[in-house]
C-alpha cells in the first residue's frame, strides 16, 4: 500500500492519532521517524492538523495508517508544558491547529466570571489575528442580570459575546449560528460547563462532565486530550483540555501594549514612543485611565499581565 490519502486529525491520545477523510472510515494512525512536518518546534501532530497518511494492514476492526506528512498550520492554540527531566524548562504544546475562532467558555458563577482570564485570551487572539467569542454559561443563576456589569467593558470593545444556559437551553441556538461553518476551539477553566455545552451542540453524549468541587470551589478537569466533533448543520468544535497556564507565545513586555486595543488611539500622544504606560511622565494612556476614557480594571489587568511576562 504505497498510495497516500489526505485527512484531518480529529483526536490525539498519546502517540495515537485518529484521522478522518470525510466520507471514509476513521483511521488510527501513528507517526514514524521519517514523518515530515512543515511546522517548526512544538509537537509534531495536533487536533485540526491536515495530514497525508499511508494506509497499512490492520489486525483490528479499525483501519490503520502511518502519517507521512503534516501540512503547514494556518493558526494554533498553544499552552506550556513542563519537560519532566528538567522542570526549569518548558516546551510549547499545540493543542489545536487550523482554527477559525477561539471560543472561551466562562460562567456567571460556580466558578465566578474571571475577567483576567478573558483579558489573557483577548491578547492571544489579537496576536494571532483570530476572532474570540466569549461565551458566558450558567446565566440561569443570574436572575438580576449582574453579569452585564462584567461584560460592559467587553461590549465597549466590540467583543463577540453570547450568553447561554446549558441548564435551560437559553442562547444555545444563537451559539449554533456563531459556530456554523467554522472550526472553533473551545477553551476555558474547568467547571464552567464546557463539556456539557459541547454535548448539547453535538447532540449526543460525547464528553464526560463534572461539577465544581465543593471543597475548593474550582472545577474538576474532565478533558485530558483534545478532540474534534462535527456539528449538525455545519461546523466543527475542538474540545481542548483545561488550560492551567495559557501560553502567550510571542507576547513580550515590549509588545503587550499593542494588544490592548483601547490603548492604540492614545499611544501616539505619549511623550515617549517607547512608553510602557506604567510610570512615564506625559503618558497619554495613563491620562486616559484617570479621565475614565480607558477602563481602570482593564488597565490594572494590563499591569498584572505585564508583571507576569519575562524580562
Swiss-Prot record:
Q: Which GO terms describe its cellular component?
A: cytoplasm
Q: Which residues cross the membrane?
A: none
Keyword Nucleotide-binding assigned to the entry: answer is yes
Assigned keywords, A-Z: Cytoplasm, GTP-binding, Hydrolase, Metal-binding, Nucleotide-binding, Ribosome biogenesis, RNA-binding, rRNA-binding, Zinc
Could you tell me the superkingdom of the organism this chain comes from?
Answer: Bacteria
Q: Does the keyword Hydrolase apply?
A: yes
UniProt cofactor note: Binds 1 zinc ion per subunit.
- Residues annotated to bind GTP: 137-140, 188-196
Q: Which Pfam families match?
A: RsgA_GTPase (PF03193)
Q: Which residues take part in binding Zn(2+)?
A: 270, 275, 277, 283
Q: What InterPro entries does the database record attribute to this sequence?
A: G_CP_dom, NA-bd_OB-fold, P-loop_NTPase, Ribosome_biogen_GTPase_RsgA, RsgA_GTPase_dom
Provide the CP-type G domain boundaries: 88-246
Q: Give the Enzyme Commission number.
A: 3.6.1.-
Tell me the GO molecular function terms: GTP binding; GTPase activity; metal ion binding; rRNA binding
The kind of enzyme this is, by top-level EC class, is hydrolase
According to its UniProt record, where is this protein located? Cytoplasm
Q: Which cofactor does it need?
A: Zn(2+)
Q: Name one GO biological process term.
A: ribosomal small subunit biogenesis
Question: What family name appears in the similarity comment?
Answer: Belongs to the TRAFAC class YlqF/YawG GTPase family. RsgA subfamily.
Q: How does it assemble?
A: Monomer. Associates with 30S ribosomal subunit, binds 16S rRNA.
> Per its UniProt record, what HAMAP family does this chain match?
GTPase_RsgA
Q: What does this protein do?
A: One of several proteins that assist in the late maturation steps of the functional core of the 30S ribosomal subunit. Helps release RbfA from mature subunits. May play a role in the assembly of ribosomal proteins into the subunit. Circularly permuted GTPase that catalyzes slow GTP hydrolysis, GTPase activity is stimulated by the 30S ribosomal subunit.
Q: What is this protein called?
A: Small ribosomal subunit biogenesis GTPase RsgA
Q: Which organism is it from?
A: Chlorobaculum parvum (strain DSM 263 / NCIMB 8327)
Amino acid at each position: 500500500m504505497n498510495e497516500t490519502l489526505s485527512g484531518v486529525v480529529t483526536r490525539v491520545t498519546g502517540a495515537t492519532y485518529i484521522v478522518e477523510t470525510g466520507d471514509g472510515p476513521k483511521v488510527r494512525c501513528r507517526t514514524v521517524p521519517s514523518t515530515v512536518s512543515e511546522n517548526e518546534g512544538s509537537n509534531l501532530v495536533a487536533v485540526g492538523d491536515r495530514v497525508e497518511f499511508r494506509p497499512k494492514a490492520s489486525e483490528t476492526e479499525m483501519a490503520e495508517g502511518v502519517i507521512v506528512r503534516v501540512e503547514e498550520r494556518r493558526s494554533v492554540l498553544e499552552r506550556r508544558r513542563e519537560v519532566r527531566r528538567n522542570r526549569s524548562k518548558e516546551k510549547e504544546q499545540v493543542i489545536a491547529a487550523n482554527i477559525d475562532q477561539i471560543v472561551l467558555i466562562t460562567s456567571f458563577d460556580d466558578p465566578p466570571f474571571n475577567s483576567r482570564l478573558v483579558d489573557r485570551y483577548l491578547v492571544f487572539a489579537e496576536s494571532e489575528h483570530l476572532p474570540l467569542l466569549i461565551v458566558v454559561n450558567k446565566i440561569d443563576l443570574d436572575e438580576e442580570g449582574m453579569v452585564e456589569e462584567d461584560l460592559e467593558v467587553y461590549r465597549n470593545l466590540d467583543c463577540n459575546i453570547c450568553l447561554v444556559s446549558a441548564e435551560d437551553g437559553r442562547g444555545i441556538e444563537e451559539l449554533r449560528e456563531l459556530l456554523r461553518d467554522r472550526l472553533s476551539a473551545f477553551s476555558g477553566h474547568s467547571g464552567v460547563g464546557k463539556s456539557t455545552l459541547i454535548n448539547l451542540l453535538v447532540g449526543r453524549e460525547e464528553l464526560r462532565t463534572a461539577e465544581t468541587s465543593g471543597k475548593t470551589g474550582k472545577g474538576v478537569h474532565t478533558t485530558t486530550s483534545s478532540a474534534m466533533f462535527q456539528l449538525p448543520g455545519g461546523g466543527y468544535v475542538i474540545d481542548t483540555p483545561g488550560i492551567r497556564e495559557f501560553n502567550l507565545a510571542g507576547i513580550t513586555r515590549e509588545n503587550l501594549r499593542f494588544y490592548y486595543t483601547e490603548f492604540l488611539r492614545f499611544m501616539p500622544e505619549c511623550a515617549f514612543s517607547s512608553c510602557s504606560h506604567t510610570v512615564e511622565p506625559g503618558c497619554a494612556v495613563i491620562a486616559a485611565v484617570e479621565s475614565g476614557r480607558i477602563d481602570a480594571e482593564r488597565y490594572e489587568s494590563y499591569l498584572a499581565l505585564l508583571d507576569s511576562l519575562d524580562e
